[in-house]
Amino acid sequence: MDESATSVLYEIRVRGLLGETLLSAFPGLRARALGTETVLTGPLRDQAALFGVLGLIEALGLELLEVRRTRP
């Protein structure tokens, strides 16, 4: 089965503008600056993958502002 068919698109917002080194920790996610925040967007295959990204955000000391599921 195509992974994109089973993945859910998420938008994850963190405080601060992430440099290339930090962004490289999130392969498969696109990043865009929005004011003084960074928005990471991309498909995650399941909640375990989402929790993995959230755990990495915590481990890197980033401040999580918002998580949104943007596609069913």
Regions found by a protein language model. Give the residues of each.
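Amphipathic, hydrophobic secondary-structure cores in small proteins
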Residues: 9-72
